[in-house]
Amino acid sequence: FERPLPKSLFNGKAVLMGDAAHPMVPFLGQGGCLAIEDAYCLSSLIKKIKDLDQMVNVYDQMRNKRGRWIQKRSRLQGLFNHVSNPVLTPVRNIITKISMRSSVTKIHSYDLNEELSLKINSQL
């Protein structure tokens, strides 16, 4: 299941997190991880930025960018996983091995605390 991502994670009344903010196919196993990151990010921003509009704007910038990138990678991984043509399967295996290594490295080397510090300091 996949649906388009919202343009913004804040509609004036509610802040979206987790699957509501960035629904994706499960081929990278990141849906729950993003929900935890979202909650941590939002709670950290609430503590540090008192202006609501400014706080949700920073949250939206941070989480929308990462969510979109992971959603795109997960979709591509799903396409590669389902290639069944015997001629293309060896090529798929090589591409998947390379792309997965790159994606997993980028996903797991992300430092939310570092990004929060940079964003919060630039807002104050």
Describe these PLM feature segments.
Residues 1-80:
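Conserved mid-domain beta->alpha element of the FAD-binding
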Residues 87-89:
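Long, charge-rich low-complexity segments
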Residues 93-124:
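C-terminal auxiliary extensions adjacent to catalytic cores
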